[in-house]
């Protein structure tokens, strides 16, 4: 169950799962090539892709950009601990952080801190500015810890989809 609901992925057949795997590898693949790879003719393949989009399995298509070419080579993770004494502090923080383009990811986590943020900036000076002028001023922020990535060993957005 997902939030009290049935897990929709359990109803996917082998062909749907293969379609999703192929689209994760190459979102720009032509329908004709995709249909060959999954063993369907083009029309039913396209119908399945459109159904998977309608049902929310496919949320969109995007280009993977090289951050080192685009002045965003410093990858930083930030632990955020909130002052839990304020009412609605989590909701206020969530609303505020969603407006920040600099934040690529924000996750509410269990453990010794409340949120884990991911950001990319040009350099340490830019990060110091982001921290001092933006992150520390977010609603309810009590403490932060910064982790600067020295080397990206593995990075992937792909989900493991078992084809059974």
Curated annotation (Swiss-Prot):
The keyword Transcription regulation applies. It comes from the Bacteria. Keywords: Activator, DNA-binding, Transcription, Transcription regulation. It holds the Pfam family AsnC_trans_reg. Residues 12-73 form the HTH asnC-type domain. GO terms for cellular component: cytosol. CDD domains: HTH_ARSR. SMART domains: HTH_ASNC (SM00344). One of its GO terms (molecular function) is sequence-specific DNA binding. Residues 31-50 bind DNA. PANTHER family: LEUCINE-RESPONSIVE REGULATORY PROTEIN. Homodimer. This is Leucine-responsive regulatory protein. The gene is lrp.
């Amino acid at each position: 169950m997902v939030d009290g609901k049935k897990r929709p992925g359990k109803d996917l057949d082998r062909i749907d799962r293969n379609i999703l795997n192929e689209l994760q590898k190459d979102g720009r693949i032509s329908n004709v090539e995709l249909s060959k790879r999954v063993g369907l003719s083009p029309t039913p393949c396209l119908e399945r892709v459109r159904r998977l989009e309608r049902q929310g399995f496919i949320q969109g298509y995007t280009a993977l950009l090289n951050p080192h070419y685009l002045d965003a080579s410093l990858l930083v993770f930030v632990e955020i601990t909130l002052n839990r004494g304020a009412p609605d502090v989590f909701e206020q923080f969530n609303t505020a952080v969603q407006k920040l383009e600099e934040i690529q990811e924000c996750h509410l986590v269990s453990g010794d801190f409340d949120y884990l943020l991911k950001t990319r900036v040009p350099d340490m000076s830019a990060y110091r500015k982001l921290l001092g002028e933006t992150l520390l001023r977010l609603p309810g922020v009590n403490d932060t810890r910064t982790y600067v990535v020295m080397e990206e060993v593995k990075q992937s957005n792909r989900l493991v989809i078992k084809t059974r």
